[in-house]
């Protein structure tokens, strides 16, 4: 099951970083995808390295939506609680199907024979128009003991 968080304004780098870290703390969240307008390649205050649970990556978009793959509906309550804390300007949380999980004909055209080499965890996470180096960053959940 997927959930979309749609903030009522674009998020800056600091808010995006805080939101992703808090969402990563929720047990039922399996993976996250951020969407938004691409930041300019030159110096921009929001184009910086952010840290999510010890993993660093360059933020390349002004966050407009956060898509989450979750284990069950109970997780939505925890997601809303995080949004209430960090998004005082308003937001919508909507369950639905947002992240593709199957390879498509478009993927086959784009990637050709190398399609079989793409890990299943990357399916549905990449921007078809982006350069390979900008496609996706996977934030691995730390194993709990």
Curated annotation (Swiss-Prot):
Keywords: Methanogenesis. It holds the Pfam family MCR_D. GO terms for biological process: methanogenesis. InterPro entries: Me_CoM_Rdtase_D. It comes from the Archaea. MCR is composed of three subunits: alpha, beta, and gamma. The function of proteins C and D is not known. This is Methyl-coenzyme M reductase I operon protein D. It comes from Methanothermobacter marburgensis (strain ATCC BAA-927 / DSM 2133 / JCM 14651 / NBRC 100331 / OCM 82 / Marburg).
């Amino acid at each position: 099951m997927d959930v979309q968080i749609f903030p009522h304004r674009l998020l800056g780098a600091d808010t995006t970083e805080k939101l992703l870290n808090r969402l990563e703390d929720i047990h039922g969240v399996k993976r996250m995808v951020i969407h938004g307008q691409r930041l300019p390649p030159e110096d921009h205050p929001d184009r910086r390295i952010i840290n999510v649970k010890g993993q660093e990556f360059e933020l390349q978009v002004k966050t407009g939506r956060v898509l989450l793959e979750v284990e069950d509906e109970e997780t939505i309550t925890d997601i809303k609680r995080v949004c209430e804390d960090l998004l005082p300007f308003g937001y919508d949380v909507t369950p639905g199907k947002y992240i593709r999980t199957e390879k498509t004909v478009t993927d086959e055209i784009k990637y050709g024979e190398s399609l079989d080499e793409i890990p299943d965890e990357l399916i549905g996470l990449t921007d078809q128009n982006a350069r390979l180096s900008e496609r996706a960053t996977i934030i691995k959940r730390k194993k709990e003991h």
